[in-house]
Amino acid sequence: MQALLFISCGAILGASLRWAIGLLFNPLFSSFAFGTLIANLFGCLIIGVLLGLFWQFPQISSEWRLFLITGFLGSLTTFSSFSSEVVELFFNDKWLNGFCVLMMHLFGCLAMTVLGIWIYKICSQLLS
């Protein structure tokens, strides 16, 4: 039951941030939901940093992992919104837009995760 509390608290914060990002960034482009891309890229950057942290300090409690990764990042990032937005572009015969959004999410998120790990490693070395 305690694990559910940690996940839920993280999810409240992650979902709130995702909603705010959508409000701020979605109006910028009419061709696709820019807020979803920003939320996913930011979430992947943060998970990269957290992966580096958890790899270096495996003794960090599972509660923090549940709060940050499962709760916060799980609700901040959104595969279902990304999927529905790409499918909608395809169904509206906006094939190029759909493919571009698909590639931005896929490769952008992978790159941001790697960047997050590198950022953690560099900061860790500078601070030690």
UniProtKB/Swiss-Prot annotation:
Residues annotated as transmembrane: 5-25, 34-54, 67-87, 99-119
Residues in the signal sequence: none
Disulfide bonds: none
Xref: Pfam families: CRCB
Database matches in InterPro entries: FluC
Family membership noted in the UniProt record: Belongs to the fluoride channel Fluc/FEX (TC 1.A.43) family.
Annotated function: Fluoride-specific ion channel. Important for reducing fluoride concentration in the cell, thus reducing its toxicity.
Record HAMAP family: FluC (MF_00454)
Protein name: Fluoride-specific ion channel FluC
Organism name: Haemophilus influenzae (strain PittGG)
Gene designation per UniProt: fluC
